[in-house]
Design a protein with these regions (language model features):
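Bacterial Sec-dependent N-terminal signal peptides
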Residues: 1-24
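Low-complexity, acidic/polar, glycine-enriched regions of mature
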Residues: 20-181
Length: 181
């Protein structure tokens, strides 16, 4: 009987290990966004607690960002961002779900491979199809995902007050850096 229990436990633990090898995950990903313009105060924030998961067999990718996790140099900017622009109480998170086109783990090395990613970004209650380019590198058994792209706040019904518009860029530059284990 003990042997049967032991063999069953080994079988299920083995299956869990096999399944977990199909996914790479992080809960400490980094997203930085910037909407600065010359001659005005820097409009830049970072979030160091972004979650992301990649299915290494299918190329499916999903990411979750808690909006209150973005931190600015100036506390007042952070307050305005959460209360007036992104409305974090009403829209507490942004979610991306997509697919890495032609993803093949075997083709990725430490120098990295560029891939096209297509998916849906839900931000401020609005879902939009987006396409971005990502660089994916192997780092030991881990994957590093790097991307830079632009977003237009108007496309997500994020209203910038007229008094602030001249002090912010019309498009927001987004930098993504995830180390998935």
């Amino acid at each position: 009987m003990r042997l049967l229990i032991l063999l069953t436990a080994i079988f299920f633990l083995g299956k869990t290990t096999v399944f977990s090898q199909d996914k790479k995950i992080t809960k400490t990903g980094q997203i930085i966004f910037e909407a600065s313009v010359p001659s005005f105060e820097e409009v830049k924030a970072s979030n160091q607690a972004v979650s992301c998961i990649i299915n290494t067999k299918t190329g499916e990718i999903a990411s979750l960002v808690l909006m209150r996790g973005f931190h600015f140099k100036v506390a007042l900017m952070e307050e305005h961002f959460n209360e007036n622009f992104i409305e974090s109480d009403k829209f507490p998170k942004a979610i991306f779900k997509g697919t890495i086109k032609d993803f093949n783990l075997a083709n990725i090395d430490s120098k990295g491979t560029k891939f096209n990613v297509n998916g849906t970004l839900t931000l401020h209650g609005i879902s939009k199809e987006i396409a971005v380019i990502v660089l994916i590198k192997k780092s030991g058994n881990d994957l590093e995902l790097i991307s830079n792209f632009n977003l237009d706040p108007k496309e997500f019904n994020i209203n910038i007050p007229k008094i602030i518009k001249p002090k912010m860029a019309e498009t927001v530059q987004v930098q993504v850096n995830f180390l998935l284990k």
